[in-house]
């Protein structure tokens, strides 16, 4: 948890000040401002733990337990050894510099461990308007200074797993090198990163692009200079290291060397061709440069690869690949040397997606290799490791694959691999979803198994598309990129599983029925299967709907206020509506394809839409829409709008662009007219939360620019005045996808970020409340029935669902279910219920929203657990003093 500082500056907003003026004009000619209040908030993440690609892990070579991780869109992190967690370092990055949350490289200074550097920038094409920068810190990332570069950097571009592109000279730590993309060559600083100049003597800026024909500029960009490695044996303290190796994205000329501290350079003679060198790691003690090669830049692709060893004294090259070239269907990338035992080398098959990634290990400098898993008799395999993902149980993806696939997988996109330079037993590696690690790695060599588990707590890297906070049930439901989304029954615990049945790769939109919050709908992207799903138990369980013809993506979706009908605006076809749960769809009339859709939160027949500056209204359940007469709204589609819970026809709309109308609008007549709020220079999201104690109108939240300041704002008086609730240390880059308050906790706000997960804030004064807690300690009487199902099982772990049915004649107002495991099973995490354990006996109690169970009704909860030996089912379940029947 991090606490913001109370802002001391107050700015004033005059009514009507510059209403409708474009933000560019405001920036050029700032007007006087007054009285914009600020509040002190505490901020933390709704825990997911990971959720995105970690392309780089860097250990400091001279200070034990000092390590950093970089992400492609979610900033950089420092390892906290005492808690085994990661601390975010770039939350200060603001709206205008959002691209600086993409980190292309991190360098930790081995001479002065307090110094750390980050090369930042997300895209090299026009998706990111800003140039890259090098950030420098003298306090391990607590604070930063920035040097802007004359070119862009690509933390989320193809080739981002190669590296490290940024390096500090281990002898003269005022000297740094940076490998640039896009043909900009090699750059050097001689004043500890304050200023930079191109190394004009370096002969090759690279020429490899993933897809030269890509007109967007994303895949067609030259991946440039990919890594810099110093030979520390060729220097002394205070003088620049003489021998420097540089990797280049050029399949014929992938490695260069300087032996005069960068004055001159030459192509390394005798090197292999036809591949890109993803990594170059030097073992100065034995005089070897190890290189991991792939036929592409990754991180997704790569069909062939090799490992080579270069003898720095003789110039001899040796192919040390653990697999014959003809047998590779993957490239190599992750590469590390055990600094305590430099003859020990490890590498990853980063692009082996099926059946799993592979990790190779050699203890004789690449002479012979063993691998993390191997086939016994296909498709059966034997692992040298065990995996325990009980701390992040969703990493199983709810899957039950056929051999040789296993769940959880060892990984994919495994381009970051590092052995702790002070501890041969500790290794960390990044995947497309998490950081895994072990602290008994040398078991590998003794023939016993080493234990892998997530080492990712504190690192939150999901991109958030939508958020809802229902008035009952789970406090938060999220729609996420890559991992689909979660039902967050607790904000401080990792959810057990992402949404499944179906499991969207990306959930694009999410809604619930305001008057019946158990009914939830989501839409999203899926290669094969439906693009829409429904839940009747507040998102705990799901079932897929049926797609209308032509659907290619999730789009936006809205649930009627009573949950009886839905309107869907998917990609690939026009707006559709249905009664029931999406078994049959009909085309809506009067509204264009691609419109954003939402529902009125009171009238179940009223739905709203927006497209290209026009607001649309349907009063017949989405069958027909009529264009509103409202004018002056944003002309583009960069708009989010919502209807107020409990306020029929009360609609708020945020959005726009710098070259046109931009701000926040309010309608009280169902969208027939809108009034633009004065003083809100720009706004991109709007949401609602519990009213303040002395207010009659719900609290408003927005990600906006107000009073010339970008931030997260709160209003308790219907938008008349605004309070900034974040500060400059907590900005999280781009926050324009979604925002919502909490209808049960005054002041709480959930903010969608583009790579830092879901952050939520509470008032520091203590009004923020806590997570909705469990209900009373109940012992209901009456008949009961239990259905116990093991839904997934893996080595050492399992997942189970429990369905408890009231078969009596009286309603329960709270319940408490007891059972005893017959073996050594232990519950590690439970959702939709609170649990306690004494030995092997477990008690599961209701939470507040599922305490009431009518006769004939059921309640379901689930859990993950650990086991060894056998995983037999409990023989009986008891509700108070009554033994339940079994289904």
Predicted regions and their residues:
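Extracellular glycan-interacting surfaces
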Residues: 2-771
